[in-house]
Amino acid sequence: MAATSEKQNTTKPPPSPSPLRNSKFCQPNMRILISGGAGFIGSHLVDKLMENEKNEVVVADNYFTGSKENLKKWIGHPRFELIRHDVTEPLLIEVDRIYHLACPASPIFYKYNPVKTIKTNVIGTLNMLGLAKRVGARILLTSTSEVYGDPLIHPQPESYWGNVNPIGVRSCYDEGKRVAETLMFDYHRQHGIEIRIARIFNTYGPRMNIDDGRVVSNFIAQALRGEALTVQKPGTQTRSFCYVSDMVDGLIRLMEGNDTGPINIGNPGEFTMVELAETVKELINPSIEIKMVENTPDDPRQRKPDISKAKEVLGWEPKVKLREGLPLMEEDFRLRLNVPRN
């Protein structure tokens, strides 16, 4: 009996890739799956990975928040494949790497369909881990700074366990990601799966959904439309904003590095919501007003990543400052909103 128990607790070596991947009929390319690859961050990750001619990229997306428009320049490319697929259903495919990004990341979307959100986080992650186990792929999960909840430690290191409301309106996302991290480590310990976990902080840039309720996209859209910038009270709550190209660089470094994580990927530059609104106003439309509105439940008072581990382990830190990134996002929003420059 003791021998059986000991056997069950033994960590298994990583599974071998399918023999078909090493056959003489296969190209020696790296075949990479991105779940949620038609979304904001996912599509930028596709762009970066496609720069390497040894990469074949497969995107699986159900277009709940993503858009085929984000990938239009790659459709028809011989190294690119797009599959309409919901990760809550199993996917049978041969790959070497899995970037698991699929999940609504905006409060508007995940509050609209909280059950779908937690199913994506839990069942979707189980399916991606099952795929990784079958084919011997390395898998990276994009977790979130939301696992820290309304933090009592500032800035937040990876060792902080968080302060999360498990039954609040945001918990489908916050707790869903915490469960996803648990599943990743359980598959790693029990089945030897190669895992990587990134805790990503607020990210902004071109291709964000215009009306997704996130603060940077809200402010830029309002400024371009000539509307008042609506700051949720009290306005002193803080966030740290990472430009999407820096985020993608961090994710790729983590995937190809040797550390399982979790590792914070974010920009430690911290701004209050009033400071962000004033910056957007100054850069885009100085004539508009800033208006205070009621806040939503469980909104964290402060959020700033401790990126010491990312610097040490990945040699990564963000390069794009907020004042450099906002105009790039403004240009994208101008085109999509049909707002000409004066």
Swiss-Prot record:
Substrate binds at residues 170, 202, 215-219, 232-239, 299-303. Residues 1-11 have a biased composition (Polar residues). It comes from the Eukaryota. Optimum temperature is 30 degrees Celsius. Its main location: cytoplasm. Its cofactor is NAD(+). Keywords: Cytoplasm, Decarboxylase, Lyase, NAD. The keyword Lyase applies. GO terms for molecular function: NAD+ binding; UDP-glucuronate decarboxylase activity. It catalyses: UDP-alpha-D-glucuronate + H(+) = UDP-alpha-D-xylose + CO2. Pathway: Nucleotide-sugar biosynthesis; UDP-alpha-D-xylose biosynthesis; UDP-alpha-D-xylose from UDP-alpha-D-glucuronate: step 1/1. One of its GO terms (biological process) is D-xylose metabolic process. Residues 1-22 are annotated as: Disordered. Its EC number is 4.1.1.35. Belongs to the NAD(P)-dependent epimerase/dehydratase family. UDP-glucuronic acid decarboxylase subfamily. Catalyzes the NAD-dependent decarboxylation of UDP-glucuronic acid to UDP-xylose. Necessary for the biosynthesis of the core tetrasaccharide in glycosaminoglycan biosynthesis. This is UDP-glucuronic acid decarboxylase 3. It comes from Arabidopsis thaliana (Mouse-ear cress).
